[in-house]
Each structure stands twice: as C-alpha cells, then as structure tokens.
Amino acid sequence: MKAPVRVAVTGAAGQIGYALLFRIASGEMLGKDQPVILQLLELSNEKAQAALKGVMMELEDCAFPLLAGMVGTDDAEVAFKDIDVALLVGARPRGPGMERKDLLLENAKIFTAQGAALNKVAKRDVKVLVVGNPANTNAYIAMKSAPDLNPKNFTAMLRLDHNRALSQLALKLGKPVGGIEKLVVWGNHSPTMYPDYRFATSDGASIGDAINDQEWNASTFIPTVGKRGAAIIEARGLSSAASAANAAIDHVRDWVLGSNGKWVTMGVPSDGSYGISEGVIFGFPVTTENGQYSLVKDLPIDDFSQKYIDKTLAELEEERSGVSHLLG
C-alpha cells in the first residue's frame, strides 16, 4: 500500500466541503490505490466546529478503505502540518451591501494568514488550489504570503468555468462532452473570464468551423458561461457547491496524475506569456505531467480575443492593486 497523502481542506464543513470530502476519501481525486489523511480546518466558533465534527462522523461511517486518518481543527498550522495538497475552499462570502473591495480586504486577511501557515508547516512541494472567491486574487495573496514556497505551487480554480464551457459547447453541437478537446478559458474566475473555443475540436473536427457563428459566441456562449454561477443561485437558492467540488477534484487529479496530453485550464502565476503581467494568477491553457503543469504557448490571439483578455486582466490588476498595501 502507498504511504498516505495528507490533504488539507479549509471551510471543510461548508457546502463545497461537504460535496468534496467524500469523493476525496473514496479515491476519486488522487487515485483508487492512494490512501489519504484529511486535515480539516473550520472557523473557531462553536457552530462551525460542531458541524465539522458531524461531517467527520459521517466520513467515519462511510468506512472508506482509503481514509487513513482525519484531523479536525480551527488552527491553520495544525491543518497544514506536513500536507501534500491544500484545497483552500473557505472564504468570506459577499454580504448584503458589501462592496467588492471590502470583500477583497476581508479575504486578504484570511489568505495572508493561511499563506503564512503554509509557508511555515506545509511540505515544500505542497500543491495549493484556491477555490474560495475571489479565487485568483486569494491565490495571489496566499502565494505572496509564502515566500519560501515556489510560486508555481499556488493555483486558482478556473476548472468550473472550463467545465461549464465544455457542456455549453456539447449542447450546441449535440455531441458528447467527452469528445471535446483544446478548449481554453482565459483570465479571472469572474464574469469577465473568456471561454475561447477557437482551437477546440470535437472528435478531432474544428468546433469553430462547426458552429461558425460569432454572434452566438459573443451574445450567448460567453455570457452564459460567465453568468452561470448567478443563474444557479437564482434557480436553486444556493450557490453551485457540487459542481465546484467536482471541478476542484478534476483540477487536482489532473495536476497530480497528469492530463494525458489534454489541455486543461488552471489559474497559475503568469510567466509573462500572452502579455499577461508576470506573477498575476491568470487562467491559462496548460498540460500536466508528473505533478507539474506547462503552459500551452504561442497560440495566436485575434483582436476579438485580445479585447476580452485585456478586460479580464484589467480586473485582476485592479484587484491586485487593491490588496498590494497588505503584502509588503
């Protein structure tokens, strides 16, 4: 049997955590032969800690053969001790009447502290995925707060946007989603992100040629993907927790086990490619192998695409400047 992998999940008793933990413990994220130890972080208030205890009881009651141990805590340094993978799900949600900049600052406090704790106690090759919104900027804050860790260890989740775009293309084409490859989602995990199917294929045939409808792209496809989260809240009365958890599992699984040459979207620190300012955590097409990701380079960017990329980059740079005074 392999040695267990230590996986930390923050916000572990929340909606996404609840949709996530049982799938991790069953082996869906790291493989059916890989034992895991779950290190679960929740807020220190009594209600959150009681809810966490209940989730841990349920995990015990599943008798997962791969679940080699659990820790439940309100202390980030306990949760992050010697971890291999961190899923930073917990974040301050936007309250009524709260400005986006206030939300940024509230979350900056959380992710500064969590970045520092990762820096202090996590394994040096820890893989960090930030799910809690605003995910790109929260990942940037955590990365900047962990100067002893490689910036490439920090990623933000764009996979939900990627999966949403895949399903919209499959519906439009009337084809199974599994045959679609080479989709890209550029930018921020926000309504400004840009789903780009110019290079995408369905069973090897160009999707751009098959759809050939720029009006549909601009007025239906891009806004549908961008506003999907809001549409789900309106329909369900709750945010998209199960699909977010599913995307987190996809992201980490591909990062750890490899994407088999397929393009996937990850929010990663820019190396300056495509004119994106260095260090900004931005959605890019990547391939993954042996636990490392590589950017897909040198894709042509037309004027239509450049306009969208510029817009989402401007939003990210504005977010970054809004928290830069906290990062020294």
UniProtKB/Swiss-Prot annotation:
NAD among keywords: yes
Active site: H189 (proton acceptor)
Binding-site residues for substrate, renumbered to this chain: R94, R100, N133, R164
Annotated binding of NAD(+), by residue: G11, A12, A13, G14, Q15, I16, G17, N107, Q114, V131, G132, N133
Keyword NAD among UniProt keywords: yes
Any Gene Ontology biological process: malate metabolic process
Reaction equations catalysed: (S)-malate + NAD(+) = oxaloacetate + NADH + H(+)
Superkingdom, natural source: Bacteria
Single annotated GO MF: L-malate dehydrogenase (NAD+) activity
Top class in the EC scheme: oxidoreductase
Disulfide bridge map: none
Classification via InterPro entries: L-lactate/malate_DH, Lactate/malate_DH_C, Lactate/malate_DH_N, Lactate_DH/Glyco_Ohase_4_C, Malate_DH_type2, NAD(P)-bd_dom_sf
Segments traversing the membrane: none
Keywords from the UniProt entry: NAD, Oxidoreductase, Tricarboxylic acid cycle
HAMAP family on file: Malate_dehydrog_2
Physiological role: Catalyzes the reversible oxidation of malate to oxaloacetate.
UniProt similarity note: Belongs to the LDH/MDH superfamily. MDH type 2 family.
Name of the protein in question: Malate dehydrogenase
Organism: Xanthomonas oryzae pv. oryzae (strain KACC10331 / KXO85)
Gene behind the chain: mdh
